[in-house]
Amino acid sequence: MTNIRKTHPLMKIINDAFIDLPTPSNISSWWNFGSLLGLCLIVQILTGLFLAMHYTPDTTTAFSSVTHICRDVNYGWIIRYLHANGASMFFICLYAHMGAGLYYGSHAFRETWNIGVILLFTIMATAFVGYVLPWGQMSFWGATVITNLLSAIPYIGTTLVEWIWGGFSVDKATLTRFFAFHFILPFIILALAIVHLIFLHETGSNNPTGIPSDMDKIPFHPYYTIKDILGALLLILTLLALTLFAPDLLGDPDNYTPANPLSTPAHIKPEWYFLFAYAILRSIPNKLGGVLALLLSILILAFIPMLHTSKQRSMMFRPFSQSLFWVLVADLLTLTWIGGQPVEHPYMIVGQLASILYFLLILVLMPVASLIENKLMKW
């Protein structure tokens, strides 16, 4: 008798995706981040659901409803901080996942990569609207500043901003719709993640060498299920340590002050995971130019498959490209630091140089290094 997991219509899908899936035998821990992102998404949806049961999306009660969750709801404080720090863990895993994809040439799977870029935009949108919900000072002013960027669009900009706001400023209508968006978007992310997996399983996984591994595959279960469980335990441990020992480490103290449209915080800045893009936005003195640079800083990822000039897929055997990759990582860390600093002399010029280097690395230096490496292979 054939095993039920191979014959049952639903079990067969699960079996082909997580049990009998042929997987390269040499994939490293950098391949753990996909499953960790799935875990993060589940944690966020569950904690978010319980928070939504007690939260009220109204300007007069939003801030106090979050306080109520932390003080009066059973284990409300841990649910709230798991959700807030879960977002940080989500982005850590996301950036590691993207970095590994870039390093090992996973962008050769065009469809999977492009769905990934769409997923990134959706996750960033979800995190942004979610940050507005506690209705603290940084929530309010962050929403005002970031939505206002759309007014830089010629002709329709102002109308578009007022349409998103649902009025002439960030107010009750804005908060209500942002809550609606924040509730629906994770389910869209879930659907997109399934599509992402479908496309990945069409081609099979890449591996660190970038060389086809069809002749050397092993079943996903038990080898990689065990490996994923180890990663999951480390993720949960880190998340719990952050939540229980330093819940406000990555947050902004200004968000513990209720939103006040009449008082602007000294330094308006987004959460840490958006600071690199915020630094690029601020480094251009022109509003429209800044908005375009901000958009391109993320959208540039969609062009990476076209910018791949190397004859090798992975960077494993390409020392020049490796060096430039780590320069890019250092550059992004520099931009993240600059994004959190005030707009004054030393920081502004460093931010501008780091922004130029970011685009220069991706558009010019890395493709040129790949061409040089191609020449060196003939020696």
UniProtKB/Swiss-Prot annotation:
Question: What is any one of the record's Gene Ontology cellular component terms?
Answer: respiratory chain complex III
Stretches that traverse the bilayer? 33-53, 77-98, 113-133, 178-198, 226-246, 288-308, 320-340, 347-367
Look up the record and name the cofactor or cofactors this protein needs.
Answer: heme b
Q: Does this UniProt record's set of keywords contain Ribonucleoprotein?
A: no
**Key words of the record:** Electron transport, Heme, Iron, Membrane, Metal-binding, Mitochondrion, Mitochondrion inner membrane, Respiratory chain, Transmembrane, Transmembrane helix, Transport, Ubiquinone
What is the protein's major site of localization? Answer: mitochondrion
Subcellular location(s) of the protein = Mitochondrion inner membrane
InterPro entries listed in its UniProt record: Cyt_b/b6_C, Cyt_b/b6_C_sf, Cyt_b/b6_N, Cytb/b6-like_sf, Cytochrome_b, Cytochrome_b_C_euk/bac, Cytochrome_b_N_euk/bac, Di-haem_cyt_TM
Give the binding site residues for heme b b562. Answer: 83, 182
Q: How does it sit in the membrane?
A: Multi-pass membrane protein
Residues holding a ubiquinone: 201
GO annotation (BP), single: mitochondrial electron transport, ubiquinol to cytochrome c
Give the residues the record marks as binding heme b b566. 97, 196
Which cysteines does the record link by disulfide bonds? Answer: none
Q: How is the cofactor bound?
A: Binds 2 heme b groups non-covalently.
Question: What domain of life is recorded for the organism?
Answer: Eukaryota
Spell out the molecular function terms from Gene Ontology. metal ion binding; ubiquinol-cytochrome-c reductase activity
| Job description of the protein | Component of the ubiquinol-cytochrome c reductase complex (complex III or cytochrome b-c1 complex) that is part of the mitochondrial respiratory chain. The b-c1 complex mediates electron transfer from ubiquinol to cytochrome c. Contributes to the generation of a proton gradient across the mitochondrial membrane that is then used for ATP synthesis.
Outline the subunit composition.
The cytochrome bc1 complex contains 11 subunits: 3 respiratory subunits (MT-CYB, CYC1 and UQCRFS1), 2 core proteins (UQCRC1 and UQCRC2) and 6 low-molecular weight proteins (UQCRH/QCR6, UQCRB/QCR7, UQCRQ/QCR8, UQCR10/QCR9, UQCR11/QCR10 and a cleavage product of UQCRFS1). This cytochrome bc1 complex then forms a dimer.
Miscellaneous notes = Heme 1 (or BL or b562) is low-potential and absorbs at about 562 nm, and heme 2 (or BH or b566) is high-potential and absorbs at about 566 nm.
Family per UniProt?
Belongs to the cytochrome b family.
UniProt-recorded name of the protein: Cytochrome b
